[in-house]
């Protein structure tokens, strides 16, 4: 019985990373405002990728909504976002992991311009 349990645990451990790789990365908007533009760049650069808000049906990410992130490898990124009040903010050193959700909270929006 122990042998069977051990085999099951080994198979489960091998299967979990596969499932995570199949799930998309997602951004969870925990700010107070709807986001109209959301860009990612490798940390420390200004090589902004495509507007990820275009991945959403209405082109925006409401407060407490999740957004599918596409064409972005796991790694450490800076994010630039624009909200409905036209405030532009940079959030640095976000860790994006395959199949995981990362979030930005209002209190993290310290580098903003209007």
Residue ranges and their predicted role:
Residues 15-20:
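Sec/Tat signal peptide C-region and signal peptidase I cleavage site
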Residues 26-34, 71:
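Asparagine-centered strand-capping/turn motif at beta-strand->loop junctions
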Residues 82-112:
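Structured interaction patches on ligand/partner-binding surfaces of diverse proteins
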Residues 21-25, 65:
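Structural beta-strand segments of beta-rich domains
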Residues 48-73:
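Intrinsically disordered, low-complexity Pro/Gly/Ser/Thr-rich segments with frequent PxxP/GP/PP motifs
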Residues 32-44:
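Short, ordered, surface-exposed loop/turn motifs in non-cytosolic proteins
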Residues 4-14:
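Sec-dependent N-terminal signal peptides
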